[in-house]
Amino acid sequence: MTIKDNSQLFPLAKQQVNMRSVLAVMNAAEQLRDASSELIPSLLRECKKIDWIYNPLEYAWAPHAEWIRRFSGNGATTLLVGMNPGHGMGNTGVPFGCPEQVRDLLEITNLEVHQPNPLHPKRPVLGLKCPKPEISGRRIWSSLAQRYGSAHLISQTIYIVNHCPLWMFNQSGKNITPDKLTGPATQCLGSICNDHLLAVVDAMSIKRVIGIGRYAQRQVDALFKNLELGWVPHPSPASPFANRNGGADWRRAFEMVLEH
């Protein structure tokens, strides 16, 4: 079969739908990137708990865009929603992007990750070659790989985003989560994050949205009234449940949510 005969394997209409999905998700991410970066000075002024803000959509845009290009147009109808970046996405630009799994499972490699400016001395960014794993991301991606197989097969069912794109710390480098923020700029941030989530759901024709952790669950429950919704406890190593029985209890809970 020649290249011109590809339409017999992949109907043109389906190709166009997938490409429209990718372009719409990319556009939504670009808007979120730019709008959230514009809010950073106001957030730093108004929120006394935060002293440092990174936006991985800015400095790690290349791998994030690759994530969108390769995995947002493959037919997934279930969306997993996290809270905001941690060490994984903070280094790789991929939601829950444990560096080893971004490299080995997603095969996103050899893309430039810039340095945030200013850089917190206790929060270095090493990019895709970062040797330190993110336990939350490792738990999620290893469970998905065990259930579905390759990254492409995962993306035919599952896509992942974070509600908030910003990685925030206090002066000592302690992680500050979005639920700790207050002030008008925080309300603006929540609004643009909601707009992004709505755009992704619309672009991908998502049927089911699963919040990862209580914060994400609350955002999902408030936004979507006509979709199937779910929730799974956050896999953070700071969670006693996620650590129980070596993580087996969390994996079982995740499996049950995916099977529902």
Label the model's feature ranges.
Residues 226-260:
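Short, flexible loop segments at boundaries between secondary-structure elements
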Residues 220-226:
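Short loop/helix-cap segments at secondary-structure boundaries that form the rim of catalytic
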Residues 4-208, 217, 240, 252-260:
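A polyanion-binding, active-site-adjacent surface
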Residues 84, 214, 235:
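Active-site metal-binding loops of divalent metal-dependent hydrolases
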